[in-house]
Curated annotation (Swiss-Prot):
Classification via SUPFAM superfamilies: PRTase-like
Molecular functions (GO terms): guanine phosphoribosyltransferase activity; hypoxanthine phosphoribosyltransferase activity; magnesium ion binding; xanthine phosphoribosyltransferase activity
Lineage: Bacteria, Pseudomonadati, Pseudomonadota, Gammaproteobacteria, Enterobacterales
Co-factor requirement: Mg(2+)
Keywords of this entry: Cell inner membrane, Cell membrane, Glycosyltransferase, Magnesium, Membrane, Metal-binding, Purine salvage, Transferase
Cellular component terms (Gene Ontology): cytosol; plasma membrane
Designated gene of the protein: gpt
Subunit structure and binding partners: Homotetramer.
Residues holding xanthine: 92, 135
Topology with respect to the bilayer: Peripheral membrane protein
Species of the source: Pectobacterium atrosepticum (strain SCRI 1043 / ATCC BAA-672) (Erwinia carotovora subsp. atroseptica)
Binding site for 5-phospho-alpha-D-ribose 1-diphosphate: 37-38, 69, 88-96
One biological process term in Gene Ontology: XMP salvage
InterPro entries listed in its UniProt record: PRibTrfase_dom (IPR000836), PRTase-like (IPR029057), Xanthine_Guanine_PRibTrfase (IPR023747)
Catalytic reaction annotation: GMP + diphosphate = guanine + 5-phospho-alpha-D-ribose 1-diphosphate; XMP + diphosphate = xanthine + 5-phospho-alpha-D-ribose 1-diphosphate; IMP + diphosphate = hypoxanthine + 5-phospho-alpha-D-ribose 1-diphosphate
Entry protein name: Xanthine-guanine phosphoribosyltransferase
Length: 152
């Protein structure tokens, strides 16, 4: 990845709220299935905004920090996804998204961020991200002191 896109907590909450507005009315949804781990925080934010209490997870491992590797399904929510929102933080190459579509063909699949290769696989997203850009999510960072350039 040549570029980095840094996401703050404030930005994430604003984007999640925008996505939640598009998912109204909330009564049409039985629940949310969050893709672990990237979709856990967006899933919680959507659940809050939409007043949804039924939240489940599907646990798919496909990243090791900034390296993609073979996909492994660790745990899945039951059913075909009918009436459920499946949420992940981003769709990148589409590997995870294809697995989600196979597992939950009737779900409404959403992400906060979408890269071009995976964009056609989601039903909705908020922000376009170039394919060669790595997204630094707020849960992967911490605030630290940065000394002034002058050293004074």
């Amino acid at each position: 990845m040549s570029e980095k896109y840094v996401v703050t907590w404030d930005m994430l909450q604003i984007h999640a709220r925008k996505l939640a507005q598009r998912l109204l009315p909330a009564e049409q949804w039985k629940g949310i299935i969050a893709v672990s781990r990237g979709g856990l925080v967006p899933g919680a934010l959507l659940a809050r905004e939409l007043g949804i209490r039924h939240v489940d997870t599907v646990c798919i491992s496909s990243y090791d920090h900034d390296n993609q590797r073979e996909m492994k399904v660790i745990k899945r929510a039951e059913g075909d996804g009918e009436g459920f929102i499946v949420v992940d933080d981003l769709v990148d190459t589409g590997g995870t998204a294809k697995a989600i579509r196979d597992m939950y063909p009737k779900a409404h699949f959403v992400t906060i961020f979408a890269k071009p290769a995976g964009q056609p696989l989601v039903d909705d997203y908020v922000i376009d991200i170039p394919q060669d850009t790595w997204i630094e999510q707020p849960w992967d960072m911490c605030v630290v002191f940065v000394p002034p350039l002058s050293g004074r």
